[in-house]
Amino acid sequence: MRCKRIAALGLACLMLAGCGSHAEETTLPPETAPSIVETLPAETTVPETTVPPATEPEPALEAGVTVVADGDVLESGSVLFEGITYVKADEFFPALDEGEYAFYETKGHTLLWKGVEYSILPDHEGLIRDGKTMILSAPVLTRRDGIWIPVEELCGMLDISLLSDPSKETLYCTAIASDWSWETGVRIPILMYHGVTDNVWGAEELFVSPSDMEEQIKYLVENGYDTITFEDWSHLEDFDKPVMLTFDDGYLDNYEELFPILQKYNAKATIFAITVSVDKDERTMTSEQAWEMHHSGLVSIQSHTYNHPHLSKCTEEELHNQMLWSKLHVARITGYEPFVICYPYGDSDAEARDIGAEYYSFGLNMTGGLYTTSTNVFQIPRYYVARNTSLSAFIDMVDEAGR
C-alpha cells in the first residue's frame, strides 16, 4: 500500500514539472479554522423562589338533594353545611322565572325580584337588600367553586314556596301565589271544559268539537279578551277583559287537539290532571306531553287530585293523601309545584277545603257562574261549556269580563 502511494506521488510530480510553462499557478487559500464567537451570558437577576402559602383545605360539604328552581334542575344540586341546605347563587338566581339576574364586579350576584334588588358579594356573610345588609341566620359560603346561599332562608325572604319530595330526594322551589296579593272586584269568567275531540266516548256532552273550540278561542282573541292562568293573577291590572279556559282530567286530546289551537292563537289554558292516570291511561296525556305544554308558557298544569274521589266522602287521612300525592306528582312532571286544586265532581265540604288550603292557594268548583275576585279563593265558580253550547251562549258567558 505504501509503495502505491509513493508511485502515485512521483507521477504527479513529473506531470507538474512537464506542464509548468503553460499552466497558471494556482494558489489555494490557507486553511483557516472557523472563528468562534464567544458569547457571554447577559447578567440576569434570578427571582427568589417564593413558596405560596399553604391553602387551608375547605371544610368538606356533604352532597344534598336535587334542587329544581322554577322548572330548572340546578346543575350543582345542593350541599349540606352544618345541617343546612345550600345552593349556588349563580345557578339559583338565573333559574327564577320572575327575576332578573345579573353579575356586577361591585355588587356581585344580583337578583331584581318584585321590584327589590338582592345581591350577594364574595366573603360577605349577609344578603344585601336594596343596599342594606341583612344578616342571615346561616352564613353565605364563599368557596373556590362559587358562592353558596342557604336556600330555605332565601326562599322565605323571596316568598318562594319549597316542596320537599323525600322519596325522590328532590326539593322544588317555585314562585307561586300563596303570598301574592291581587286586585279584587275583577270579573273573570272561568270556563270549564273536559275533552276536545269528535271521537267521543262516555258522556258525549263533555267533549267539545275542535272546530267549536277554535271558533270560541278565535272570538276571544278578535274581541280583545285576555286568556290568562292563575300565574297571571299577580298582575291582573295588565288585563282589561280576563277570561280563563280550564280543562278537567287531562285527556290526550288536550294535547293533540287543544294545544295546537292555543299555539295558533297564542292563547292560554289551565289543565287539571288526575295524576294517577298520567302515563297509564291511553286516553290521557303522557308526562312528556304535560311537560311540553307547561313549559310552552301557554298551559298551566294543576291538580285534579290523585285518583278523582268524592272529597266529601274521604277521611282526613285520605284527604291529605289526595292533596299531597297529586301535588308531588305534578311537580315531578313539570318541575313546578302546583298551587291550584280542582275538586272532582265539584264535590267538597268544609273539611276538604280546609285541608286543601294547607296544600294549595286556590280551589275550584265545577259550576256556579261568573267569578269576581275576592278573598274567597277556595270556592271559585265556573261556567260549564258543553258540546252543545252555542257560540251565542258562549259569548253571553264571557260578556261581563272586566271591571
Where are these regions (language model features)?
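Acidic (Asp/Glu)-rich catalytic clusters
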Residues: 221, 259-267, 285-303, 356-357, ...
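Bacterial N-terminal signal peptides that target proteins for export
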Residues: 1-7
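C-terminal motif of bacterial Sec signal peptides marking the signal peptidase cleavage site
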Residues: 15-18
